[in-house]
A protein has these predicted regions:
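Mobile, glycine- and charge-enriched loop segments
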Residues: 36-47, 134, 145, 149-161, ...
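ATP-dependent carboxylate/acyl-activation modules
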Residues: 111, 311-313, 428, 432-433
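N-terminal leader/targeting and accessory segments in enzymes
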Residues: 1-95, 99, 275, 344-348, ...
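Acidic, Mg2+-coordinating active-site environments of NTP-dependent enzymes
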Residues: 73-80, 186-323, 348-349, 374-383, ...
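Residue-level signal for inorganic ion chemistry
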Residues: 43, 62, 96, 111, ...
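Active-site beta-alpha connecting loops in nucleotide-dependent enzymes
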Residues: 50-53, 309-312, 328-399, 426
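Phosphate-binding loop of NTP-binding sites
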Residues: 5, 92-222, 226, 230-238, ...
């Protein structure tokens, strides 16, 4: 518990700023920054600290760069009239976000899941944006810092919020729901992601289900995967729900003649820029939620056709002689299997899969990498290339490389003419570096 009157080294007493005072400052300066290198004029700079740095030491630099106030938690960095002292900067940011959320009379849709949550969030936001003023999570700012930043970016004229929630430990989704207080929830799936932090698949299910628990406790509305037996069982006795199930859309047909997904729906042909059968359910979720909120069918189709993946997520990149599908943002056994199966099914002259290591698998890492190596070399993909220490240790007929630089040298001399090339791996592998040579 902090002292009621913290002191600077010179003995000067400094009062803590109350939440009400902090919120009054936010209303005057409704822009929040946490990076002193990205200061916007008249913002509030929250001097967050990490394991290897003291954010308070950047407070004065943020002020010089144009911040209205710096929020600090160390009295020695106090500058009268320019800093606001709080017991803990991170908690102050989270409390401010919750306080702001309580004053926003808008519905918030929150979603989580092992795979597809960022793409689904962006599709939902694009569809709802055809009718409403929507504020959605930027990129994947979906953690204990990103969620409050998303909430604080919602202004009085915001009509719907779409908040993505990420977690790699139990209890995190519950904490994020406490801030966002969602009125609607959706879990994309339960997969083999962050197994190390969650302690196995059962831990993943328990952790992600905290979203539905928070929604049901508040008697709010749930969107759920009807074909997922886990979700079906958990929600069997809950009435306030809407199912998302491709089987409910008999009028939606999925074309396999093109590598990117093409939907026929209600007399419309929707040519998307998304790769992979696994994105079909994400499109269905956006359609179902769009129709639930009364977005016209034509507008939904326009939004889905116009959506372009970015940030290395299922990006289709055309080259003169071949086509790349760059999915280098993240990977786990569930998403890797789905991507490989889709690559094997598309109609293309030749196919190459370049796969990078999957991280955060804990004690199952060797087993899961061996499974993916065997799958990739057994489903009709012409060329399989594996890169990373985990994949290099597998027993496989595929070409293996222990690091990216070795692979770049090999790729520079490789003929990929007429190939569809899937590039997929965990974020830490940074496989987008391969674009320097292909």
């Amino acid at each position: 518990v902090p002292e009621p009157y913290p002191k600077k080294q010179n003995g000067q007493k400094v009062n803590f700023t109350s939440l009400e005072e902090l919120y009054a400052s936010f209303l005057k300066h409704p822009s929040v920054c946490t990076d002193s290198r990205k200061i916007t004029p008249n913002c509030l700079f929250f001097a967050l600290s990490g394991p290897n740095f003291n954010g308070n030491s950047f407070a004065s630099a943020a002020l010089e760069a144009g911040a209205a106030f710096s929020i600090i938690d160390k009295p020695d960095f106090y500058i009268d009239g320019q800093t606001l002292l709080v017991p803990d900067v991170l908690i102050a940011l989270q409390d401010l976000a919750k306080h702001h959320r309580n004053r926003l009379n808008i519905p918030i849709i929150s979603l989580t899941g092992s795979n597809g949550k960022t793409t689904t969030k962006e599709l939902i936001a694009a569809v709802l944006g055809q009718k409403f003023k929507v504020v959605a999570t930027q990129g994947n700012l979906n953690n204990h810092i990103g969620v409050p930043l998303t909430l604080l970016s919602m202004s009085p004229d915001t009509e719907i919020g779409v908040v993505e929630m990420g977690a790699n430990h139990q209890g995190e989704i519950k904490m994020l729901c406490g801030m966002a207080q969602p009125n609607y929830g959706y879990i994309t799936n339960f997969g083999k992601a962050h197994l190390e932090g969650f302690g196995g698949v059962e831990g993943v299910i328990k952790g992600k289900s905290e979203l539905y628990q928070a929604i049901t406790e508040r008697h709010e509305h749930i969107f759920y995967r009807a074909e997922d037996p886990i979700q079906e069982e958990k929600l069997a006795n809950y009435a306030n729900k809407t199912s998302i199930d491709p089987g409910q859309f008999p009028e939606i047909e999925l074309s396999r003649k093109e590598p990117t997904l093409v939907l026929s729906w209600s007399g419309l042909s929707i040519k998307t820029q998304l790769f992979g059968d696994y994105n079909f359910i994400n499109l269905c979720a956006a359609i179902r939620i769009g129709t639930y909120f009364g977005v016209p069918i034509q507008k939904i189709a326009e939004a889905l056709s116009a959506y372009t993946p970015n940030n290395n997520r299922s990006q289709t990149l055309k080259r003169d002689q071949y086509t790349l599908v760059l999915d280098a943002y993240n990977a786990n056994p569930s998403s890797m299997s789905a991507a490989l199966k889709h690559l094997s099914q598309i109609e293309a002259p030749k196919k190459t899969a370049i796969l990078g290591d999957m991280f955060e698998l804990g004690s199952t890492a060797a087993e899961e990498h061996q499974y993916i190596a065997e799958l990739a070399t057994s489903i009709g993909i012409d060329q399989v290339i594996l890169v990373g220490n985990h994949f290099a240790g597998t027993n496989t007929s595929a070409k293996t490389f222990s690091d990216i630089e070795q692979l770049k040298i090999a790729l520079a001399d490789m003929d990929l003419s007429n190939h569809w090339v899937l590039i997929k791996g965990s974020r830490g592998m940074a496989l987008e570096r391969l674009l320097e040579v292909i």
